[in-house]
Amino acid sequence: MDDGRDEEIFTDLVASAVHDVKNSLALVLNSAEHITDMEAVPAAAHESLLLLQHEARRANADLMGLLGLFKIERGSSLVRPAVVECEDLIVELLAYNSGLLASRGITLEAGEIQAAEGYFDRGLVAGVLNAVINNTFRFARSRVTLSCHLEDGFTVFRVLDDGEGYGPKMLSNQPQEPGEHSHRSTGLGLFFARRVAELHQHRERIGRVVLTNRPGGCFELWLP
């Protein structure tokens, strides 16, 4: 028996199963979003649908991260960088997330956008930022601000909320392992975000994730 071949087959099966579940979850999410927009939905059901929408987005982000990590481990090229207009990406993030956050009385707004263009994988970066914004559904009090600026040769995307901030363990600069739970994360999302950042490299510069409290949670994605 070829243990290496068996492991490869098992990995392929798991990746395929995760992909199928992700597709099914996407259908559930689309249906929930469609029903939520219907005027005839009772208030009590509307609240449940919004929670379902939030949790489905969170699970979908985790599955996308898991698939991405599978591809990285298999040596697949995950990052396909291109020139991206930063303001367009911010507008896209606002459009996708504003309605859900507004249902909780949270205003999602654009802050200062100093970077006109960046060179990165738009899909991966949008996925990371959407997951971070969706997470503020539980932790922001009333406001979340998206901004983008240039610093030391990096394009920096920032998600700032007015909640209680990140816990000490998440601020310790020690990368969380997948499955390790903390105040605001299961670990997988942050682990994948760090890997996406690190896969963006230019000359001597390597992308990174920076977490701070200002005093609410401040997530920064630094892309060279």
Predicted regions and their residues:
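Conserved micro-motifs of the catalytic ATP-binding
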Residues: 74-79, 117-120
